[in-house]
Design a protein with these regions (language model features):
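Adenine nucleotide phosphate-binding catalytic loops in nucleotide-utilizing enzymes
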Residues: 16, 205-206, 213, 239-264
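Short, polar loop motifs at secondary-structure junctions
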Residues: 73-81, 229-233, 250-251
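Conserved beta-strand scaffold positions in the cores of enzyme catalytic domains, especially
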Residues: 87-89, 112, 138-140, 245-247, ...
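Phosphate-binding loop of NTP-binding sites
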Residues: 96-229, 233-243
Length: 264
């Protein structure tokens, strides 16, 4: 179970999580949601369906279908005529999904490792996950689910059995990392490098650094930042939220460095 209760301590969709208006049978408010998806084909019994307006398809058109498939509740940006189940009326289903993800993450007793950088995010995620899986139950970002749609879906996939979540976060513009890290609230934040990606929005590498380090504002109180010492831009970051950053790199002066290199 994802344990997003429609009312109570875990998740109150109506009041505490997405600030919408509940419309439907009041006796269903204690229903427990067992999953949350944006793809109507993935809806199962007890799921929350979040319809997203895309360039070609509006997910709202599938609301009747998902109720037939057993959806417990849906979100909607407009009032529904004779729906087969309850729904929460919200201004933006995308924004509501982010609020739900942020609320759910904060309700979990789990450590979160956030990973970002211009390149190397996915391989770093896989390496960190592989090491942690030797001792812990790990939930990690699947594929490229690292943006403002994919990250909340990844967070919804966390279960009580998981001890660590390794979350990849990708951005292309200012403000995106702010929104992503608001949802993920990392305990450890890894930045692989500051490159030349998305300069059409970020201007130059200093802009990339500024955008990537927006994540520092939303780290957990005792969180640590792990930065690449071999990156000239990241090397300028001395402290993060009053604490020294942990540096890794090729040189022995780094806090963590390689002593042996092998290739297959």
């Amino acid at each position: 179970e994802i344990r997003l209760s429609l009312v109570g301590s875990e998740m109150c969709i109506r009041d505490r999580a997405c600030e919408g208006t509940y419309i439907g049978d009041e006796t269903l408010l204690d229903t427990t949601i067992t999953g949350a998806v944006i793809d109507s084909r993935q809806v199962k019994e007890g799921y929350l369906f979040i319809p997203i307006k895309g360039e070609r398809v509006d997910g709202h058109k599938f609301i009747p279908t998902v109720f037939e498939q057993g959806a417990a509740i849906v979100l909607s940006e407009h009032e529904l005529k004779d729906p087969a189940g309850p729904y929460v009326l919200v201004e933006s289903t995308t924004d509501a999904m982010k609020k739900l993800a942020a609320f759910y993450r904060k309700s979990l007793d789990i450590k979160v490792v956030g990973i970002t950088g211009s390149v190397g995010k996915t391989s770093t995620k896989e390496m960190i996950s592989s090491v942690l899986e030797q001792k812990y139950s790990v939930h990690k970002t699947a594929g490229n689910f690292n943006n403002e749609i994919g990250l909340p879906l990844t967070i919804f996939g966390i279960r009580e059995s998981h001890q660590v979540a390794v979350l990849e976060m990708g951005i292309s513009d200012f403000g995106e990392m702010h929104r992503l890290s608001t949802m993920s609230c990392p305990d450890v934040m890894v930045i692989t490098n500051i490159g030349y990606c998305h300069l059409e929005f970020l201007g130059d590498r200093d802009g990339v650094l500024k955008a990537k380090t927006e994540c520092f504002e939303h780290m957990m109180p005792d969180a640590v930042a792990v930065l690449n010492a071999d990156d000239d831009k990241l090397a300028t970051v001395q402290t993060v939220n009053g604490k020294p950053a942990i540096y890794y790199g090729k040189e022995s002066a780094s806090d963590v460095h390689k002593s042996v290199y092998t290739t297959n």
